[in-house]
């Protein structure tokens, strides 16, 4: 199995760190210790003693989770492990062939129990599934929850201090499975395994994937019978907006407060870590906010009175604004941005019909069920804000309470009649202002990323219209590839485009191999428009850099470090799935993961022709592919 670890890592480390085999990994269960359990199975022992089939679908109230053990597949084969994930979790890569590792990530062993046949103690670290709800395509869907994902334990990397929750997706039924079977199929599991690590390698906030285990004998019914699989994945938190949605829909203000306190104290590094009230909502003013406000301090007065819950909401909003800015800058489309798929921590989460754009098309959606284009590329920033407003509805009482959020009567009895108008007015005002902050943070982050992708050292006010918008309009008009454009731009020397004739000649490198589509106009028009844009870009490059050879080399290096050579596009993932699932190949998964974990490389040293094919032009009839939510 050691061959199935990529030799690439996504980030540099500061020397060696202490690593562990999975059994010795430091483990905790803050989530289950500090939040209320399912009353039907309130302890690990009660759940462990129950027949596995009794732990299936039902309504769960007044709880954040249910204790439930994985339901192992009939047989398993560990086919992929991310070295970057091993490093970040402090797992010794030489131990992945051990039975402990393989049986843990396949759901066959509860690694936290010394005796699986015995009775676990009440304080034992025992697997659980989270309870949440959500708005799906804008409509309330009721109780959802981890219908096939089961968290095993939390672990803190001793070198970084980062805590992660490790979870198995496809590990069997839970009380939140509804009408589903608790399983995941190979095709969706391969897609999630690859894209989780791809986004991380591109520095896009995301949940992660540790391993991929196939279940050759596990037959799962979807549109047809398919083999099953389990992805071991991890994140700083798996809490979603939908976690709060469900409590709000049930009027459970006690659980909302418990969840909010847990996020402020456990998910983030404490109340003092949260961002203070901004001096204004201009882009420049919101980029870096001071932190360190004491937990009980209230900033502002009257309808602008901000307590710690407002600061908590601000942190969640800012993280999601930055996340979606990364999506837009790298043309990643999630495909299903329901509130149960929107992270409190600001992570890309729950990968279904996702895709990276090929040709730039702002109306593209990778989800063939999204007929109204609700979740298309251009709508992602507004949809994330729509979801955050749903979170604000859950937080509204806590935000609106201002300085009275800890008053005994408010905490125990709720909002008194004579306080309602003041509370509502304050909440509406602060949520509206946080919306302004969301837009400002998004734009500031988007401009920062696009400035870097264009090889500029600083952003000018005119860049947005003259460079960013004009480039995107040109790509859309002539059906050109988004990410390839930036990579090709990276290597252009300003001397190569110092005349209009040269610029028109260079413009051809952005065309597809087959040339321009007949529906987009003439090649001469395309060359002229691209040349005009290149002239503006060249001028800005020379403003920020000198025209020396050294400056050119520095700029090329800087641009190649942010403009990927390889992205796991839909056509590549489809081919990968076919070769792994249908043809039984294994090496190709290793190769794709090597490229995925080092996407900015010029080459990876295995097969130059194959690397060129995978990094090159997308086959004409495999552009803008769509898929379903079925997984």
Where are these regions (language model features)?
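Short, flexible segments with low predicted structural confidence
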Residues: 56-59, 170-171, 298, 363
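Glycine- and acidic
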Residues: 67-68, 175-182, 298-310, 369-377, ...
């Amino acid at each position: 199995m050691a061959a199935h670890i990529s030799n690439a890592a996504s980030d540099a480390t500061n020397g060696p760190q202490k690593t562990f085999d999975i059994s010795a990994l430091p483990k905790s269960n803050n989530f289950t210790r500090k939040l209320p359990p399912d009353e039907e199975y309130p302890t690990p022992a009660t759940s462990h003693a129950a027949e596995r089939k009794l732990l299936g679908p039902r309504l769960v109230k007044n709880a954040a989770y249910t204790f439930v053990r994985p339901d192992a597949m009939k047989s398993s084969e560990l086919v992929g492990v991310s070295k970057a994930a091993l490093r970040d979790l402090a797992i010794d890569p030489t131990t992945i062939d051990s039975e402990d590792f393989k049986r843990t990530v396949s759901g066959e062993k509860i690694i936290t129990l010394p005796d699986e046949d015995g009775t676990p103690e009440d304080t034992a670290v025992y697997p659980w599934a989270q309870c949440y709800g959500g708005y799906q395509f804008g409509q309330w869907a009721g109780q959802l929850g981890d219908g096939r994902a089961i968290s095993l334990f939390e672990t803190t990397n001793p070198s970084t201090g980062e805590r992660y929750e490790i979870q198995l997706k496809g590990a069997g039924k839970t009380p939140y499975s509804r009408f589903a079977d608790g399983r995941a199929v190979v095709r969706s599991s391969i897609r999630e395994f690859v894209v989780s690590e791809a986004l991380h390698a591109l520095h896009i906030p995301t949940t992660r994937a540790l391993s991929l285990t196939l279940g050759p004998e596990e037959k799962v019914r979807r549109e047809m019978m398919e083999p099953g699989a389990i992805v071991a994945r991890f994140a700083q938190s798996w809490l979603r907006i939908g976690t709060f949605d469900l409590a709000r829909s049930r009027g459970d203000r006690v659980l909302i407060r418990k969840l909010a306190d847990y996020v402020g104290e456990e998910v983030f590094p404490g109340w003092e870590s949260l961002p203070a009230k901004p001096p204004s909502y201009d882009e420049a003013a919101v980029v870096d906010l001071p932190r360190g406000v004491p937990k009980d301090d209230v900033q502002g007065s009257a309808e602008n009175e901000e307590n710690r819950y407002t600061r908590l909401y601000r942190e969640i909003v800012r993280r999601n604004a930055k996340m979606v800015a990364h999506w837009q800058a790298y043309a990643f489309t999630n495909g299903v941005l329901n509130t149960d798929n929107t992270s409190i921590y600001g992570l890309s989460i729950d990968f279904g019909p996702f895709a990276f754009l090929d040709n730039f098309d702002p109306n593209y959606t990778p989800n063939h069920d999204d007929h109204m284009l609700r979740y298309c590329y251009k709508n992602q920033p507004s949809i994330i804000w729509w979801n955050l407003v749903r979170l604000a509805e859950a937080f509204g009482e806590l935000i609106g309470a201002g300085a009275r959020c800890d008053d005994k009567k408010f905490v125990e009895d709720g909002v008194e009649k004579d306080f309602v108008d003041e509370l509502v007015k304050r909440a509406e005002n602060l949520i509206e202002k946080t919306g302004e902050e969301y837009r400002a943070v998004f734009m500031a982050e988007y401009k920062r990323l696009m400035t870097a992708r264009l090889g500029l050292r600083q952003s000018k006010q005119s860049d947005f219209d003259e460079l960013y918008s004009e480039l995107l309009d040109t790509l859309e008009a002539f059906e050109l590839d988004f990410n390839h454009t930036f990579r090709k731009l990276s290597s252009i020397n300003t001397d190569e485009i110092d005349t209009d004739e040269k610029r028109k000649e260079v413009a051809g490198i952005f065309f597809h191999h087959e040339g321009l589509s007949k529906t987009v106009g003439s090649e001469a028009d395309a060359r002229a428009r691209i040349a005009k844009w290149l002239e503006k870009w060249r001028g800005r490059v020379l403003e920020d850099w000198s025209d020396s050879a050294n400056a050119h080399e520095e700029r090329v290096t800087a641009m190649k470090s942010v403009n990927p050579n390889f992205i796991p596009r839909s056509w590549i993932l489809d081919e990968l799935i076919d070769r792994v699932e249908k043809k039984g190949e294994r090496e190709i998964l290793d190769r794709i993961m090597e490229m995925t974990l080092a996407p900015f490389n010029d080459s990876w040293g295995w097969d130059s022709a194959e690397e060129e094919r995978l990094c090159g032009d997308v086959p004409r009839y495999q552009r803008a592919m769509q898929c379903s939510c079925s997984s």
